[in-house]
Regions:
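N-terminal capping/small domains of soluble enzymes
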Residues: 14-92, 98-101, 288, 336-341, ...
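Glycine-rich beta-strand-to-loop/alpha-helix junction loops that act as flexible
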Residues: 188-189, 218-227, 256-258
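Charged (often Lys/Glu-rich) extended helix/loop segments that serve as interaction or gating elements
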Residues: 239, 256-395
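Conserved, mostly hydrophobic/aromatic
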Residues: 35, 58, 87, 143, ...
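Short, Lys/Arg-enriched N-terminal segments with co-localized hydrophobic residues
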Residues: 4-16
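Feature marks short, surface-exposed loop/turn motifs that line or immediately flank catalytic pockets
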Residues: 149-151, 190, 226, 260, ...
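Active-site-proximal beta-alpha core segment in soluble small-molecule metabolic enzymes
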Residues: 51-217, 231, 239-242
Length: 395
C-alpha cells in the first residue's frame, strides 16, 4: 500500500511539473526523463545479457531525440530506404535493414546505408546477393525465417499466420543455407513477454537449429516489451545467456521499438464541441483517432486518458470523437469527475510509439505539433505543421 501511495504521489508530482498551458494543442509531448529511464533499462539488459539491442524505427523515429538515444543505444533497424538513410544521417550508424521486398531502384541505397541486410525470401536473396558481391561492400546478409509459431492473437500483427508473406518456412530450405547467408532473422512477437520469446526460441531451434552452428548472427526481431512494468527482465537475461551458452559463436540481436518509447509521453488535445444523440454525449477534440492515433482503431485498443476512467454509472460519461469526417473516428466510453466543457484539455497517455510514424493528413486535418519536455522541465518545440505540409504532400 505504501509503495502504491508513493507511485501515485510521484505521478501527481510529475504531472504538476508539466505546464499544460505552455503546450500548443494538439501536440505530441515526449518526456525526456521517462525516455532516459527506458533507455537505461534497455542498455542494462544489453550489457548484462551480452546481446546487441537496436532501435526499430517503425515504432519510433523522432530523430530530433536521437542525440539522447545515442547516449545509450547507437544502432537501429530499418525497413525501407528512407529509414535506412535516417539511421545513417541522424543516428550516425548504418542500419540493420529488412524489407518484405527490395526493388532494383532502391537496393543500391539500401546497401549504402546498411551494415546488415535481411531478405524475406530465397528469390529476393538470389536476385540481389550478386549486387552485394559486386558492390564490394561489407554488408552482412541474412534470411528472415518463419517459425510458424506466434503468441500474437491479433491477426493484423501476427506474421506467422497460415499463408503469411513474412519469412521463409523450414520446408523451403534444404540441409544447407545458400552461400552468402551469414545470419537468420525472425520476428514473431508484439508487445510480448520473455516467456513468449522462450516458446518462440524453442520452435526456432526445433525447425532451424541445424543452421545455427553455421551462421554468425541471429536477429530475434522486435516485440520485446522489456520496459513494461510487469515484464520479467531477469528471466529475459537468463534466457538470452542460456541461448548464448548453447551457441557461443552467435551474435544475438534484438530490435524492439515500442520498448524504447513505452509510456514516455502523451498527446495533448482540446475539446472543441460536445454533441448528444440518443443520450450519448460525444466530446469532439481537435485531433483524430484515424489520423493521429491509428492503432486505437486498427488493433483496436482503448487508450488511457489522464484523470479519466472507464465508464462509471452516475458519473459524467462521454465518447471522444475525432475531428475528421470518418463516421467511425471515435472511441469510448470514458467517465470524468465533472462534466466536460469546450476548451478542456484531454491528455491521451502513451502516444509516442506507433503514432508519429503512422500519422496522416486525411481531410486536411492539421498534424499535431511535436515537442519534448526536457529533463530541466522546459518545453522544447521540435516541429509545428501548417498548410504547406498538407499541400506539399500532393505537389
Amino acid at each position: 500500500m505504501f509503495s502504491l501511495y508513493l507511485h501515485i504521489h510521484y505521478e501527481i508530482l510529475r504531472y504538476s511539473m508539466i505546464d499544460i498551458n505552455k503546450i500548443p494543442s494538439p501536440c505530441y509531448v515526449m518526456e525526456e526523463k521517462l525516455l532516459r529511464n527506458n533507455l537505461s533499462l534497455i542498455k542494462s539488459v544489453k550489457e548484462r545479457a551480452g546481446v546487441n539491442i537496436i532501435l526499430a524505427f517503425k515504432a519510433f523515429a523522432l530523430w530530433k531525440a536521437f542525440p539522447i538515444v545515442r547516449e545509450y543505444i547507437p544502432f537501429s533497424t530499418a525497413s525501407s530506404k528512407f529509414e535506412a538513410r535516417l539511421a545513417f544521417e541522424e543516428l550516425g550508424s548504418p542500419a540493420h535493414t529488412y524489407s518484405p521486398a527490395y526493388t532494383e531502384a532502391d537496393f543500391p541505397l539500401i546497401l549504402r546505408y546498411s551494415s546488415h541486410v535481411t531478405f524475406n525470401s530465397l528469390s529476393q536473396f538470389h536476385r540481389f546477393y550478386p549486387m552485394v558481391r559486386a558492390d564490394g561492400s561489407r554488408v552482412s546478409c541474412g534470411l528472415r525465417i518463419n517459425p510458424e509459431y506466434s503468441d500474437v492473437e491479433t491477426d493484423l500483427y501476427n506474421p506467422c499466420a497460415p499463408g503469411s508473406r513474412m519469412g521463409v518456412t523450414c520446408d523451403l530450405l534444404g540441409d544447407t543455407l545458400p552461400e552468402g547467408v551469414e545470419g537468420l532473422h525472425f520476428h514473431t512477437l508484439c508487445e510480448s513477454t520473455s516467456y513468449d520469446l522462450e516458446r518462440t526460441l524453442a520452435e526456432v531451434e526445433r525447425r532451424f537449429g541445424r543452421f545455427l552452428p553455421h551462421v554468425k548472427w541471429l536477429n530475434m526481431g522486435g516485440g520485446h516489451l522489456m520496459t513494461r512494468k510487469d515484464y520479467d527482465v531477469e528471466h529475459l537475461i537468463a534466457l538470452l545467456k542460456g541461448f548464448k551458452e548453447r551457441y557461443p559463436h552467435l551474435e544475438l540481436i534484438m530490435e524492439p521499438g515500442s520498448a524504447f518509447a513505452w509510456q514516455t509521453g502523451f498527446l495533448l488535445t482540446t475539446v472543441v464541441d460536445i454533441v448528444e444523440n440518443h443520450g450519448v454525449k460525444t466530446a469532439i477534440i481537435d485531433a483524430s483517432f484515424t489520423c493521429h492515433m491509428p492503432d486505437c482503431l486498427e488493433m483496436p485498443y482503448k487508450p488511457a486518458i489522464r484523470f479519466a476512467t472507464d465508464a462509471v454509472e452516475g458519473k459524467p460519461t462521454y465518447r471522444i470523437g475525432g475531428n475528421s469526417c470518418l463516421s467511425g473516428d471515435y472511441m469510448g466510453d470514458w467517465s470524468f469527475d465533472k462534466p466536460l466543457e469546450i476548451g478542456d484539455k484531454l491528455i491521451f497517455e502513451d502516444m509516442i510509439h506507433y503514432t508519429i510514424v503512422k500519422t496522416n493528413m486525411f481531410n486536411g486535418i492539421p498534424h499535431p505539433s511535436l515537442a519534448l519536455w526536457d529533463k530541466d522541465d522546459r518545453l522544447v518545440m521540435y516541429r509545428t505543421f501548417g498548410y504547406e505540409d498538407y499541400k506539399n504532400r500532393m505537389d
